[in-house]
């Protein structure tokens, strides 16, 4: 091995170690309650930036009997590695409602949401789960945020990207339906932001008869493509696409 190749390898190793150290600094915000959610994730599109999220449960003063009915505030921040002061922040009171359909988990989404050549959004996925077995209702909602100066701004509000619902007897008879939505950035744009192509795939399940002789049939609907366009403030969602 030549001295030049040794030097290049050493530089590459040093850079890898420094990057690894920066990424290792990701620390979720401190929790204040058992029902709260806290998480952090490094942002691959911007290697020196980290996203943090803290969702704090606020019990309903009238209807909360078991610590499950209420709302969740949401606080987001983008920080640089090793710096305690955030570069940009966002706070929303009562961002999510939680009752019979309870907030089960949060997830930071750093997929390639490229809205302009120089601007990428990140996402927050909120997973909800219903308490009824015979009337299931599970949903995942996706919201997108962009950094503008020292603020974070929502540009997509609670798009339903997964839903599972139905009505059955818990053994066989009844109907259930699952819809999965995926996003792709379009080649066209509206008000400066790329249009978003949403692909919806719905699968149905119908059961008939008693448990021991249950007959079930699965149906697959043709995928449906829907274009979301930015109106200068937010992406407009068609009826039925926005969650609670």
Task: List PLM regions with ranges.
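Short N-terminal edge-element motif at the start of the domain
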Residues: 62-116
